Amino acid sequence: MAGLEILSPEGFRLDGRRPNELRRLVCRMGVFTQADGSAYIEMGNTKTLAAVYGPHEVLNKAKARHDQALINCEFSMATFSTTERKTRAKGDRKSVEISMAIKRTFESCILTSNYPRSQIDIFVQILQADGGNYSACINAATLALLDAGIPMKDYVCSCAVSFINESALLDINYLEESSSAPQLTLAILPKSEKIVLLRLDSKLHADNLEKILDLAKKGCKDVYALLRRHVHDFAKDSLASMCT
């Protein structure tokens, strides 16, 4: 990244966006007929699939909870998802870390007490990686859970921010992630602004933390507006098709 200008003197990023702009967000729900719920999301060039199965009987009886559902999450990356073409074994450290982060995020948001002694499986896969993988997975999983009819406290919306050359950049891409600058990934419940995931990848001066946290919250709310509009349109189209 040496010598590469992330932000121009005119205030534009390499992809033409302003510092506080989201990448283009594309959503589709109901992409798998075999799953109880599914979704596909593009955040810029990062492309993600999510599928939800359940609630169903707990596969490992020893893990069953008498008062709530068990949330199982599995993250993977397609072998062609990055330019590195690096083979990532199932269950490698990074995949397990992301799986656990997504699991904990949704355990705090899904109304698990509605489904005692049952299991809900969330599978997410990165098809193409270009930055913001955590956020893309969380946003896709949210849509898939809504498609499955799983009740939640609210949408879970996520966005990543970086702090480069004294500027906070919203919804970072791969080149911006590769700058070694501090990066914050945030997921919130938009209506209450409750934080359900916060990851800071490197040290950041306390004076700058509030600035990037505020921008990340703004990004999450912008994502929420887009997801909510898509869910509304999807429900409207589904109802129309049932009536014809």
Tell me the role of every PLM-derived stretch:
Residues M1-T244:
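Polyanion-binding surfaces on beta-sheet-dominated domains and ring/shell assemblies
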